[in-house]
Design a protein with these regions (language model features):
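Short helix-capping/linker turns of helical repeat alpha-solenoids
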Residues: 3-4, 33-36, 49-51, 56, ...
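Alpha-helical segment of the N-proximal tetratricopeptide repeat
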Residues: 4-34
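Hydrophobic face of amphipathic alpha-helices that form TPR/SEL1-like repeat modules
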Residues: 8-9, 14, 42-49, 76-85, ...
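Structural signature of tandem alpha-helical TPR/SEL1-like repeats
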Residues: 17-26, 54-63, 90-99, 126-137
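Canonical positions in the second alpha-helix
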Residues: 29-31, 65-67, 102-103, 138-139
Length: 148
């Protein structure tokens, strides 16, 4: 039964990656409702952007935060971006910073860059160019070559 679960979940993820969003929604929704973070994350993206359906901010936040609560790195990064931009939720730079920190700790380079920019600009935290440079370097960028 576990193999069948993985095949069906894999089909939903493949449909998402192939931009077959209506099919992806149908395939992924049961797994998201059962608590699968990868399915929840993808439903969150579809709701946030309006892929295969009308944009739904409340559902976008629900699915993205459900996946993030399980420590799913991409969802932590996505939720951080939602908080940073005030998209699908109230803007909260402190919560954005916390999400990006968790995602960066999981090795997500995009989260490291977002976090570095927050430290560089003093958003949600005190300005700290040393931390910003260290994060840019950890993400694979030459901090000295980046604009300040």
């Amino acid at each position: 039964m576990r193999d069948e679960f993985q095949i069906s979940l894999g089909s939903g993820i493949a449909a998402f990656e192939a931009k077959q969003f209506s099919q992806a929604w149908s395939l992924l929704k049961p797994y998201a409702e059962a608590g699968d973070a990868s399915a929840q994350y993808r439903l969150g993206i579809m709701c946030q952007i309006g892929l295969g359906q009308v944009r739904n901010e409340q559902l976008a936040y629900h699915w993205m935060s459900s996946a993030a609560d399980q420590g799913y790195g991409l969802a932590l990064h996505g939720l951080g971006q939602m908080y940073l931009d005030g998209d699908c939720t109230v803007q909260d730079e402190g919560k954005a910073l916390a999400c990006f920190e968790q995602a960066a700790d999981l090795g997500l380079e995009g989260a490291m860059v977002a976090l570095a920019q927050m430290y560089q600009q003093g958003r949600g935290t005190d300005k700290d160019t040393g931390k910003a440079k260290a994060l840019f370097k950890r993400a694979g960028f030459d901090p000295e070559a980046l604009p300040s």
